[in-house]
Amino acid sequence: MSRANKSQCTAVVLSAALMAISLDASAAPQAVQTPTDRNDTVEVTLDRRAPPVAVMIFNKASGGYDTAAPLKWGENSWTCTSATDPAAGACPTEPIWASSSSPTSIKLEFKEETTGATIVLNLEGTKVDVIHINCSDILIPGEIVSPGTAIERYGSWHAVCSPSKNINADGNQLTVKIPTGELKKIPTGGVWKANLVLDLRQRKDTETFPKIAVFKAAIKLDVIDKNNIQIYLPEFTSATPTVDLKLRKLPNGSRMSGTSNVDMCLYDGYNSQSTWFDVSASDGLTVDRRDKGQYSVLLDSDKSGAYESRIDYNVSLTYAGKKIALPNNETVRLQGVNNSAGRSVSLPGISVPVVCTPTPLTLETPEFQSVWKRPGKYSNKLTITFTPSSASL
């Protein structure tokens, strides 16, 4: 047979094979999902002391599929835009054949909205191969046919129908999550934000990998640090400081009064993102002949509370530039905390600065005749109670 005849015979065989494939495909049902861009929003509120098992960013997100041409998108993969910069996620930037079955570590930078503090967390990314048509040529929702592997891996798994028939995976699904161990690394409460960007890549016969879609996720973590809600008194190192009422004689010499200021800043475990604070104070006393709302200190040698053995005073706080009375055993609600001016402070046990809300106290002792009081040292406890709205989140 001449070379020409051999070529002609080969051409006929190929044509017949192609026709057989075409007829078989047309006989089977077809399902197609074209890969498209994603712009997801993830908002989660969590308690820093007890974070969830994981925060899901993408949960089995489809990279497209075509049951009639399974290898068209069945070998897709996902890559980062940078291998080193965590601003939008750092991980491999090129697809890899037969990559490790281990998840991909995606380094992503989170920034706290109020303080500007940053932290890089390691997200976990996996992909699985799926089929959308079974061995009986029946369309199905999507069956996983591979273990979870690195997201940058390309190549296709298949389902074994019989010794003579396999079904190639026709698509992939992406899962990205923040594991609980990484959530525990967030140093403070507050609003922590990040933006993840992943490119969906298609494998071509030319061994090129064009970008066919972009998967974006705007992530917002509302982190409440309930273990660190506290009243911060910058001037004192003790949790129960001693405050002098600063009683002074007036010019006439027979009367006394006093004013004492205490720097106080309230930390809500949320970088002052609470909508309101409830503040109350109490001296724990039941005293006769005392004006409503007043507090008292008692003579150390006589705790009866008698008029001549006690000194009465008033308490107020300053919030958002306004002086607010704080009556004994009453609760005052401070509104609009998240819109008020905060103060950056360093608190024990917290590795980065946080924002508290300034609410300085003023203890004012009205004028009284000193001769009407017994001489000696006067003292008592003043208990401040602070409850932010963040405590109920």
Q: Regions from the language model: what does each represent?
A:
Residues 12, 83-84, 94-95, 138, ...:
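General secretory precursor processing signal
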Residues 22-25:
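N-terminal signal peptide c-region/cleavage motif recognized by signal peptidases
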Residues 12-20:
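Bacterial N-terminal signal peptides
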Residues 297-354:
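Outer membrane beta-barrel transmembrane domains
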